[in-house]
Amino acid sequence: MSQLQEMMTVVSQREAAYNIFEMVLKGTLVDEMDLPGQFLHLAVSNGAMLLRRPISISSWDKRAKTCTILYRIGDETTGTYELSKLEPGAKVDIMGPLGNGFPVAEVTSTDKILIIGGGIGVPPLYELAKQLEKTGCQMTILLGFASENVKILENEFSNLKNVTLKIATDDGSYGTKGHVGMLMNEIDFEADALYTCGAPAMLKAVAKKYDQLERLYISMESRMACGIGACYACVEHDKEDESHALKVCEDGPVFLGKQLSL
């Protein structure tokens, strides 16, 4: 077994919000986790499901050798539904961490950081915020969800230092009514860097509003097959060269905003 593949152990699993599960995994792969925004490629035990499931890493604890993932389940025919049935002690065949993550080394204590997340794109932003907290920078975090019953990680973000957290829900059941773009309109400062992950429509809106920001980092969500750049199933167009295919699994999932043609 290579260092990028391991049978990790399920430590715990719970339904964190409606149809969104939180799984804690333990294994030596955690030693390889350094950049927030990378993902794991999980094999589903059901033999009929050949493709692995890419799931972003929400956080990790290197001393405990554990990491946490959050994922939305589908119906009973889906691989994520199968994953949600795993109990503590179960083994999961995992490759990772894969892809390029969010750069944090350049952030300083004087930076004003804007983090924008939507739905199931929120989890990888939590480890990012944890690492940014260590720099002493000021963070404004905008999160959008469909409704209160699918809201995740609010307490975790709130417990970080130097954080201003705002939440919007489409139906107005929690926080500001409307999509996360409405929260963007409330920002009255110039961000030094922006990190975002969420649905394509949200990412497009962020990229349009902040297209002049040099340090704009966008994490793309995409269906994947191989997870290592061999199959070209998860491509995005290069903004500077439309004939060039950017592979989300290998070149991303995190890209500079100026790279993407959204």
Swiss-Prot record:
UniProt binding sites for [2Fe-2S] cluster: 226, 231, 234, 249
InterPro entries given in the database record: Cyt_c3_hydrogenase_gsu, Dihydroorotate_DH_ele_sf, Dihydroorotate_DH_Fe-S-bd, Dihydroorotate_DHASE_ETsu, FAD-bd_FR_type, FNR_nucleotide-bd, OxRdtase_FAD/NAD-bd, PyrK_electron_transfer
Cofactor: [2Fe-2S] cluster; FAD
Cofactor stoichiometry and binding remark: Binds 1 [2Fe-2S] cluster per subunit. Binds 1 FAD per subunit.
Pfam families xrefs: DHODB_Fe-S_bind, NAD_binding_1
Molecular function per GO: 2 iron, 2 sulfur cluster binding; electron transfer activity; flavin adenine dinucleotide binding; metal ion binding; oxidoreductase activity
Keyword Transport listed: yes
Keyword Ligase: no
Keywords: 2Fe-2S, Electron transport, FAD, Flavoprotein, Iron, Iron-sulfur, Metal-binding, Pyrimidine biosynthesis, Transport
FAD-binding FR-type domain segment(s): 3-104
Binding site for FAD: 53-56, 70-72, 79-80
Pathway terms, separated by semicolons: Pyrimidine metabolism; UMP biosynthesis via de novo pathway; orotate from (S)-dihydroorotate (NAD(+) route): step 1/1
CDD domains: DHOD_e_trans
GO process annotations (BP): 'de novo' UMP biosynthetic process
Record family assignment: Belongs to the PyrK family.
PANTHER family per UniProt: DIHYDROOROTATE DEHYDROGENASE B (NAD(+)), ELECTRON TRANSFER SUBUNIT, DIHYDROOROTATE DEHYDROGENASE B (NAD(+)), ELECTRON TRANSFER SUBUNIT-RELATED
Subunit organization: Heterotetramer of 2 PyrK and 2 PyrD type B subunits.
Function: Responsible for channeling the electrons from the oxidation of dihydroorotate from the FMN redox center in the PyrD type B subunit to the ultimate electron acceptor NAD(+).
Protein name as annotated: Dihydroorotate dehydrogenase B (NAD(+)), electron transfer subunit
The organism of origin for this protein: Lactococcus lactis subsp. cremoris (strain SK11)
Gene: pyrK
